[in-house]
Amino acid sequence: MPLTNTQIRYYDSNVLRLPKDKRETYNAQVDRLITALRKKLKDQDKITIKRVVKAGSFAKHTILRKTSDSQVDVDVVFYVSGEKVAEETFASLSEKIYEALLKMYPNKAVEDFEIQRKAATVSFVGTGLDVDIVPVIENPDKEGYGWQFDRIDGSKTETCAPCQIKFVKERKDQDPDFRTLVRLAKRWRTNMECPLKSFHIELIMAHVLEVNGKDGSLEKRFRDFLLYIAESGLKEVITFPENSTIPAFSHPVVILDPVCDTNNVTSRITEDERKEIVRIAEKSWATANFASVEGDYDIWKELFGRSFKVEDAA
């Protein structure tokens, strides 16, 4: 017997989705960090922060709640501008943010701080929160847009955090269950150790919505997500109505960023990883179909993990 929409929504609400009280706690913690860091950077390095945007899965409401082996991750985009920016490299901006965070939290262990390719990260073990501070050089001619730099290879990508949030909201307005399906797919990805990032999943799910529409049960639509990956092999170029031009890419997987035509968000997926993603999706689709026919919750746990449940314990 297939899972009902009510059962899947129960699982999403009680196991996957970040509860309202936790969201409020994290929001308050992030707001305090933003206020302190903004002041620290201005006083310490004369860096002007023109705008701050909470971004990523947290802002899109597709984030999963904290588990025993995963933190809640919040992206905070700092739009940087002013004459001082011209004197800085992106690496130095990340370094200055990292140094400011160290000074702001002198009692935290050094391993709670990290400089990544495009962000400086601070981890709060007590609340289970990771905050990625992402510096973006503001484009004064395009509202919400700016350039995000890679600290390792020096490449830059145009981005628009508010536009990415709007993209998901518009899909949710079109399909009230869009975020539920994204969270289902993210839990599947994590449990199956599939090398897809959260942003990739959001975009693939949006593409499947565009192609198939919102008809059908939630269970079937999740299976259709797996089926799309399995049948396409992720060899099709995925674009969106927001894209105006389609450049040619040579990467194994091409999914265009809906806010930047020149950005292939899957450019770092290797051919071996593409094959692995497709292999996992094929196997998972078969497992999901078998679980649906058998009506066996234990089989669903093979896809979603031991925490999978669709009703209160008796």
Swiss-Prot record:
Pfam families the record matches: SMODS
UniProt keyword Transmembrane helix present: no
One Gene Ontology term, aspect cellular component: cytosol
Designated name of the protein: CBASS oligonucleotide cyclase CdnC
Function noted in UniProt: Cyclic nucleotide synthase (second messenger synthase) of a CBASS antivirus system. CBASS (cyclic oligonucleotide-based antiphage signaling system) provides immunity against bacteriophage. The CD-NTase protein synthesizes cyclic nucleotides in response to infection; these serve as specific second messenger signals. The signals activate a diverse range of effectors, leading to bacterial cell death and thus abortive phage infection. A type III CBASS system.
The organism's place on the tree of life at top rank: Bacteria
Phylogenetic classification of the source organism: Bacteria, Pseudomonadati, Pseudomonadota, Gammaproteobacteria, Enterobacterales
A Gene Ontology molecular function term of the record: metal ion binding
Binding residues for ATP: 60, 75, 186, 197-199, 263
